[in-house]
């Protein structure tokens, strides 16, 4: 359990998955979502990142499209971790002395012109405590969703903290430190060095805030002076304006950069993954209760095995927004299994993908008194042929692969991959229609005139929506 930035719907008073945020608003309430720091339960899927990635090669009966989607989702990146020493942290009484940056392009280090940290970075939070304008900027950043897509769509904005960081290899060069709305806290360290000449996002930011743009890579066939104006150069080439590295290829430059920062004691090579731990907390009634009790004395205590499963109460109130389990008069009030004092049940429920991530094992013996039968699972698994939608490529299918490894590790069975073969069938799709009150209409209730769609029976104008997939129900 740890604190995490989440999408918060202020009307429904619940956390929303990134997929439930549409154009910055809750998919159902329509309210602008907020970014909040809340305590959430996680499953440590990141522990298996490399294994999950390497094993994709053996899934030779899976569609190449799904394998590629999982590879990209896990997202292995090789690069360097570099420390940028803050020159003047005492001006804001900061305890932080340096900023760590992960980069996949250490070869462009001499092209750095600024440092940018996420709005959730510890440095940004400390600055905001002492700087009202910085605090206001963070509030604006928190109005965006937490997904990469939401952040990517937003206009690139930054706040100059007034701090500077020393370039680790360029003697005396200082880089201004910004808080930027496009830096993801969930990737790397939540901080970047901006190299505008070779990253379009950094270039847009630099042009907006009048920061230097220094090319340090040029195409191999360009002999004249190479200048970047409004389009970043991201292709192959050789290093320039980089001291002793001039003339090196990009790959050789990366190796030399890592050697240099390691020799100076300001960095090291590092491999990182895009895959993050799976946040499984939901403020919904219909999920499986998380079997945990919170005691003032004993802190977090698991529900004893003899008391499992924890069942949901039937007499719940859905008339108010938020989690009805929080409002239930008796269900959440229990005795601590350790000390017997008054305690409170965990009222968050599991993400529904939690249960579907291991049902393949349950299906081998649905009558078992346990979660599943080890004997039956060993006999039947892995599943020979799985048929399911491609929309599950980086959710259910990846989670099931993780569950197979985790359950094997704790001794429930001996299985690496749950599904030997996978076929992703197509979907039945059709344009969607609503009446003027926002109610869905069947296609046979709608007809098209020369200019618009109207209802068959009354001729009322119909709102034509996007093409939707058919519901499973």
Language-model features: locations:
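Conserved oxyanion/phosphate-binding beta-strand-loop segments in alpha/beta enzyme cores
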Residues: 61-64, 139-178, 340-375
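Conserved phosphate/anionic-ligand binding catalytic regions in large, soluble enzymes, centered on
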Residues: 1, 99-121, 278, 284-285, ...
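Conserved active-site neighborhood of enzyme catalytic/cofactor-binding cores
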Residues: 25-26, 139, 187-218, 288-296, ...
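Residue patterns forming the tRNA-binding/recognition surfaces of aminoacyl-tRNA synthetases
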Residues: 1-94, 98-99, 122, 191-309, ...
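Conserved, non-catalytic sequence blocks in retroelement Pol enzymes and Pol-derived host proteins
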Residues: 71-73, 153-156, 392
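Catalytic alpha/beta core of large soluble enzyme barrels
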Residues: 121-220, 225-226, 231-232
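Short loop/turn motifs at secondary-structure junctions and domain boundaries
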Residues: 155-159, 284-285, 452-454
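Cytochrome P450 core scaffold surrounding the K-helix E-X-X-R motif
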Residues: 113, 123-128, 366-373
């Amino acid at each position: 359990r740890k604190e995490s930035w989440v999408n918060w719907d202020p009307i429904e008073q619940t956390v929303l998955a990134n997929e439930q945020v549409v154009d910055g608003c809750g998919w159902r309430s329509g309210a602008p979502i907020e970014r909040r720091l809340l305590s959430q339960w996680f499953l440590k899927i990141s522990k298996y990142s490399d294994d999950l990635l390497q094993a994709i090669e053996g899934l030779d009966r899976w569609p190449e499209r799904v394998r590629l989607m999982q590879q990209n989702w896990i997202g292995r990146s090789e690069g360097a971790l570099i420390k940028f020493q803050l020159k003047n942290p005492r001006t804001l009484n900061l305890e932080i002395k340096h900023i760590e940056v992960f980069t996949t392009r250490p070869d462009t280090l001499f092209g750095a012109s600024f440092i940018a940290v996420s709005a959730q970075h510890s440095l940004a939070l400390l600055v905001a405590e002492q700087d009202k304008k910085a605090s206001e900027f963070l509030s604006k950043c928190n109005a965006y969703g937490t997904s990469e897509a939401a952040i990517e769509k937003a206009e690139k904005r930054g706040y100059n903290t007034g701090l500077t960081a020393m370039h680790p290899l360029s003697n005396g060069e200082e880089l201004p430190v910004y808080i930027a709305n496009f830096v993801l806290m969930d990737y790397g360290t939540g901080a970047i060095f901006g190299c505008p000449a070779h990253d379009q996002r950094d270039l847009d930011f630099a042009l907006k805030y009048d920061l230097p743009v220094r090319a340090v890579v040029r195409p191999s066939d360009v002999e004249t002076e190479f200048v970047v104006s409004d389009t970043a150069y991201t292709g192959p080439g050789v290093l320039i304006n980089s001291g002793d590295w001039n003339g090196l290829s990009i790959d050789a430059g990366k190796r030399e950069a890592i050697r240099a920062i390691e020799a100076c004691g300001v960095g090291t090579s590092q491999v990182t993954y895009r895959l993050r731990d799976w946040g499984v907390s939901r403020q919904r009634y219909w999920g499986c209760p998380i079997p945990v009790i919170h005691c003032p004395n004993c802190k977090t205590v698991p529900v004893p095995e003899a008391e499992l499963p924890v069942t949901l109460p039937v007499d719940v109130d859905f008339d108010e927004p938020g989690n009805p389990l929080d409002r239930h008069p008796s269900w959440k009030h229990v005795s601590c299994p350790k000390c017997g004092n008054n305690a409170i049940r965990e009222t968050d429920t599991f993400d529904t993908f939690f249960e579907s991530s291991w049902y393949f094992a349950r299906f081998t013996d649905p009558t078992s008194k346990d979660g599943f039968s080890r004997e039956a699972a060993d006999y039947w698994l892995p599943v020979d042929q799985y048929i399911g939608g491609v929309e599950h490529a980086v959710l259910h299918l990846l989670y099931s692969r993780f569950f197979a490894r985790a359950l094997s590790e704790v001794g429930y069975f001996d299985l690496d991959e749950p599904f030997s073969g996978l076929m992703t069938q197509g979907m039945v799709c059709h344009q969607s229609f609503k009446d003027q009150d926002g109610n869905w209409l069947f296609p046979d209730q709608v007809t098209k005139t020369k200019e618009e769609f109207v209802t068959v029976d009354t001729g009322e104008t119909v709102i034509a929506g996007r093409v939707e997939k058919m519901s499973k129900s």
